[in-house]
Structures are given as C-alpha cells and as structure tokens.
Amino acid sequence: MAEQDTLVMPIAEMARSNDKFREVVWTGDNSQLVLMAIPEGGEIGGETHDGHDQLLYFVDGMGKAKIGDKEMDISAGDVAIVPSGKYHNFKNTGTGMMRLYTTYSPPEHEPGTEHDTKADAEADPNED
C-alpha cells in the first residue's frame, strides 16, 4: 500500500487487516503513522529512539511491554507511551498475530517504508 494522502482513515480496521511487520501509512513534517504486526512468539526487538517519542495502540492480540525497567501485560485496547531515549520492547505472548498502529514524533522511518518481516526490517540499510 502506498502512503495515504487522506487525512481521515479507518486506522484500527487497517491495523486489524495488516500482516506486515511494518508499513508506514503517513508521514508529515513532525509525525508519522505506522502499522505493525508481530507474529505469535515474536517481538518488535529492544530499541531506544533518541529524539523520537512513540505511542503504540494495540488492536489485536496480547503480549508483554517492557518500557525502561518496567514490564507490563498488554492487550487489544491498550496504548503504550515511550518517551524519547527510553529503552523498550514488545513481545507477542498470545496466539495469533499481535497488531497495532504506532505514531512517531518526529518521523522515524523513511516515507513509504514496508517490511514484510522483522528480518526484512533488520536487513534494510535505511533502518538503524
């Protein structure tokens, strides 16, 4: 899917039908909207975004969130807030796909980025 030029979209529905590890939906000057899907037993991968705040909105599945030194259960309907510079990781501990949409401020990924799998994301030279 190409980036959207529409400013209103059914994002929860889009997230529930997404099977890609990462798909950038919209990129603005100061923020970015991204769909993600984490397979059963998978994880986003521990990381820190210096200079980027991130909000993650979970629409399907369940898992564990680690933000800083705190670990919490997450499930559909939850939001996780990750301030700039804070270590974080999200693991799918349920059955089936864990799906979410996330916002970055400012943008974190190249506009139009798509990764079918986490391995694709790790192999992308534009990802750090």
Can you say where each PLM-predicted feature lies in the sequence?
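Ligand-binding loop in jelly-roll beta-barrel domains
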Residues: 84-110
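Conserved short histidine dyad/triad with adjacent acidic residue
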Residues: 19, 34-49
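Short acidic-glycine-tyrosine-enriched beta hairpin
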Residues: 70-84
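Glycine- and acidic-residue-biased ligand/ion/polar-headgroup-sensing regions
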Residues: 52-63
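Short, charged/polar surface micro-motifs in flexible loops or helix N-caps
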Residues: 29-31, 40-43, 62-64, 106-110
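A short, N-terminal "cap"/entry segment at the start of jelly-roll beta-barrel domains
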Residues: 1-31, 45, 115-128
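A generic "binding-loop/recognition-motif" signal
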Residues: 31, 40, 51, 70, ...
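Histidine-centered metal-chelating micro-motifs
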Residues: 43-45, 64, 80, 84-90
